[in-house]
Amino acid sequence: ETLELIQAYNTEAYVERLSAYLKARETLVEKYTSKKQMEMMPVKINQEELNFSPGKHNELQKAIIENFAPRFAPNAECLYVGDTIKKDLIKNVEKLSNLGFEITLHDKMPDVVLYCEDKNWIYFIEAVTSVGPMSPQRIIEIEEMTKGVKAGKIYITAFPDFSTYKKFSEELAWETEVWLSELPDHMIHLNGDKFMGPREKR
């Protein structure tokens, strides 16, 4: 079509072919734009409608916001969440700084950071589909950038399912938590002394 348009230049057929070419191109652009928008994953964060780009990692982050937070961090504010394409989808620099964060360009934020103001708790959450659980080394890295933070710190690794959790179980640090998106009502606590004790009969 492009070649035919060029060949028709300076001829009577040029205007007609140009019109047909532009119409076809506009339809093509609309088609691919629509497809791209359909692939995005809508998510509501801090009462704001946003979109994650497609992918397993972002699917898990979406589950953290929509399923973990209401169950285990009710009324929490999302201070940070990344995206596989747009690195910082949400980053409340002012609030993070007020809480005592020291963030440099070299620091790698956890995938999701939630803050519960009523309890003064911060949830650091790594969404793991292939790499990056809350290992002892990762805890040290986060502690370094949060030396000035006085709020209570909770370290969580989120996995999509049990099989992924089992792959990384030996890397996980003690005194951290695990959440599985396939079993959203439950947590795995890697620090028995704090939660050990009989439960009331149901």
Report each predicted region and the residues it spans.
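Domain-level recognition of nuclease-like catalytic cores that cleave nucleotide substrates
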Residues: 148-149, 159-202
